[in-house]
């Protein structure tokens, strides 16, 4: 991975004797060497692979934004920026029930010609190691893959387009942990691009395009399968869904209208590109539902062939149950 490291520093969030969260500040930035470059490269990779990230942009009166601008202009050094930001982060973090201890990392770097600032809290875990004398001893390590409190600012986008609503990305965190609220408060930012909504709009546009083109059922299934295959490949490779690229892979309507032209003519508010949402796009080829003790998923092409739905009686009929399910049912 091509990565150029400008600055990186670690501080520590820990509890004092009064069980209060405090910041233990490192006296200086880390040296830029192979170890720190490998650390930041792994942080970048893991953050990039995390699903369900949110987007945002700074509020006009954001203090953090002001400190960041000073640092980027050379009016404030990176260490001072990290120190003042670490203390602000701690003050916001103690307001939330997940005031975690951990290693706080600030990293300024460039990857693939894009400048980034990464901020994250890395959990510490214990493991075992074998010493040179073949004894067993405990060792602490950074559990980077488990980080769920992290944000990354695309500095290149921010500095060229401050009106953008997506230069700031953050991990939304686990259910019940208001990590999104915490980072928005800490950075003094507002929610930006809604990726879930973008994916839902895309699904609606696909449905409407198929209906407008008067496609037969099999043609609809094939069309949706193409959309799914493209979106799924983008998700797996960590790339965004590009509407123009997707449109180029899809057949036009009978009157020659491309999918992209259709979305523009009909006024769908789709961004040129956005991250795909796996749970949403899978509904292109599957019917999925859960509730009341039931969890049902089946290929959409089976509806009307082996699976039938009667809306009047709200009944789903399955003809030809899977062998493993049939075996379980026959035993009761």
UniProtKB/Swiss-Prot annotation:
<dbReference type="GO" id="GO:0043590">
    <property type="term" value="C:bacterial nucleoid"/>
</dbReference>
<comment type="similarity">
    <text>Belongs to the YejK family.</text>
</comment>
<dbReference type="InterPro" id="IPR007358">
    <property type="entry name" value="Nucleoid_associated_NdpA"/>
</dbReference>
<dbReference type="Pfam" id="PF04245">
    <property type="entry name" value="NA37"/>
</dbReference>
<protein>
    <recommendedName>
        <fullName>Nucleoid-associated protein VP2128</fullName>
    </recommendedName>
</protein>
<dbReference type="GO" id="GO:0005737">
    <property type="term" value="C:cytoplasm"/>
</dbReference>
<dbReference type="GO" id="GO:0003690">
    <property type="term" value="F:double-stranded DNA binding"/>
</dbReference>
<dbReference type="GO" id="GO:0003727">
    <property type="term" value="F:single-stranded RNA binding"/>
</dbReference>
<keyword id="KW-0963">Cytoplasm</keyword>
């Amino acid at each position: 991975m091509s990565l150029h490291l400008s600055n990186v520093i670690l501080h520590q969030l820990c509890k004092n004797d009064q069980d209060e969260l405090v910041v233990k500040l490192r006296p200086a930035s880390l040296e830029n060497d192979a170890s720190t470059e490998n650390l930041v490269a792994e942080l970048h990779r893991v953050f990039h692979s995390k699903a369900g990230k949110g987007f945002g942009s700074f509020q006009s009166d954001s203090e953090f934004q002001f400190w960041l601008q000073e640092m980027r202009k050379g009016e404030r050094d990176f260490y001072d920026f990290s120190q003042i930001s670490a203390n602000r982060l701690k003050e916001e973090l103690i307001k939330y029930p997940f005031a975690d201890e951990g290693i706080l990392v600030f990293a300024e770097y460039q990857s693939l010609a894009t400048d980034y600032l990464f901020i994250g809290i890395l959990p510490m875990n214990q493991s075992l190691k074998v010493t040179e004398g073949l004894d067993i001893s405990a060792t602490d390590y950074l559990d980077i893959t488990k980080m769920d409190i992290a944000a990354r600012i695309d500095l290149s986008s921010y500095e060229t387009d401050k009106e953008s609503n997506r230069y700031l990305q953050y991990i939304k965190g686990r259910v019940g942990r208001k990590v999104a609220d915490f980072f928005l408060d800490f950075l003094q930012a507002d929610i930006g691009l809604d990726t879930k909504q973008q994916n839902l709009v895309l699904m609606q546009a696909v449905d409407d395009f198929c209906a407008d083109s008067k496609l037969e059922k099999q043609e609809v299934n094939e069309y949706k399968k193409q959309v799914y295959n493209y979106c799924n490949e983008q998700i797996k490779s960590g790339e965004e869904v590009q509407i123009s690229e997707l449109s180029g892979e899809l057949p036009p309507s009978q009157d020659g209208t491309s999918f992209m032209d259709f979305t523009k003519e009909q006024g769908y508010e789709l961004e040129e590109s956005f991250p795909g949402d796996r749970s949403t796009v899978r509904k292109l080829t599957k019917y999925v539902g859960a509730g009341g003790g039931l969890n049902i998923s089946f290929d959409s092409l089976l509806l009307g062939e082996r699976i039938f739905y009667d809306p009047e009686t709200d009944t789903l009929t399955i003809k030809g149950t899977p062998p493993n399910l049939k075996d379980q049912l026959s035993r009761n």
